[in-house]
Amino acid sequence: MTTLTITRPDDWHVHLRDGEVLKDTVRDISRYNGRALIMPNTVPPVTNTEMALAYRDRILAEQHGEQFEPLMALYLTDNTTPDEIRKAKATGKIVAAKLYPAGATTNSDSGVTDAKNIYHVFEAMEEVGMLLLVHGEVTHNHVDIFDREKEFLDTVLAPIVNDFPNLKIVLEHITTSDAANFVNNASDNVAATITAHHLLFNRNHMLVGGIKPHFYCLPILKRNTHQQALIEAATSGSKKFFLGTDSAPHAKGAKESACGCAGSYTAHAALELYAEVFENEGKLENLEAFASLNGPDFYGIARNTDTVTLEKASWDVPETMPFGSDIVVPIRANEKIEWEVK
């Protein structure tokens, strides 16, 4: 196959940051996506409706594709109220709220200290039909970083799923076979996003032969057996899994340091990277469902009506890309990618 035309895709989990870098991050994300769900862990975090709408306006001011629509999410804290959820839902522009366990990832210090603290907020979300997005890791110091997703599933997410059966939940950027199995065995109200980098890489890529800081992300890359389980889930055709890049840019110097930031930048070539994975598995026919259909169907949003075309054409990823007044190192920098969106 040398060309593949699919319904225009969406990205259901992306970080654009804020300020001067928006001109670059929005350029990449709006190049061929119809919509993108924008993560709210900016500085300061997007904790209320007014902040979300203002952030949306700043994004729209930089968009490059007329077809592009940013979808917004609220950042849940111990102080989030049911009234704020209702207010956000009423805008029609804020489609979800994000649960970050405090300290779990970049700019998550204001996150929720205990999910039970906001059960009344989950009740309101269930009532109005707002989706719950979950960063699925515990933050206890005694739990090994490679085990934090599994521990979260057992101790935090399972009770939420049980206590709120009508709440739609997306387990974001899953990284383990445990998470894939959890989603497969849960009700149809539970789904998951999977990143391109967790499909393409495992912890050996990050650690063998020297530390590769641009592969460092949270949740952290796991062993090969987990990577294979993610590939199987993503390419299976199951409606429970869909595209969410978790593209998370940091300036080159913030990554290549003694205490580097977590996050990998893939928005420059996300669909092309996913296409490589699906082609390698002989499952290109399932890429459209994963990238373009399952996400809007789960969110209850109309599918995009136009298309994009991928061509089998090798191209070189640049060593760096503009990031405001700085630069970012994209995934596969100085390497070739075998598909290209035309």
Swiss-Prot record:
GO terms, biological process: 'de novo' pyrimidine nucleobase biosynthetic process; 'de novo' UMP biosynthetic process
Keyword presence, Methyltransferase: no
Amino acids binding Zn(2+) 1: 13, 15, 98, 246
MF terms (GO), sorted A to Z: dihydroorotase activity; zinc ion binding
Domain of life according to the entry: Bacteria
A Pfam match: Amidohydro_1
Active-site feature positions: 246
Record bears the keyword Lipid metabolism: no
Record keywords: Hydrolase, Metal-binding, Pyrimidine biosynthesis, Zinc
EC annotation from Swiss-Prot or TrEMBL: 3.5.2.3
Cofactor(s) this protein requires: Zn(2+)
Chemical reaction(s) catalysed: (S)-dihydroorotate + H2O = N-carbamoyl-L-aspartate + H(+)
GO cellular component: cytosol
Binding site for substrate: 15-17, 41, 135, 218, 250, 262
Cofactor note: Binds 2 Zn(2+) ions per subunit.
Pathway: Pyrimidine metabolism; UMP biosynthesis via de novo pathway; (S)-dihydroorotate from bicarbonate: step 3/3
Enzyme class: hydrolase
Family label: Belongs to the metallo-dependent hydrolases superfamily. DHOase family. Class II DHOase subfamily.
Protein name: Dihydroorotase
Naturally occurring in which organism (per UniProt): Vibrio campbellii (strain ATCC BAA-1116)
Lineage per the UniProt record: Bacteria, Pseudomonadati, Pseudomonadota, Gammaproteobacteria, Vibrionales
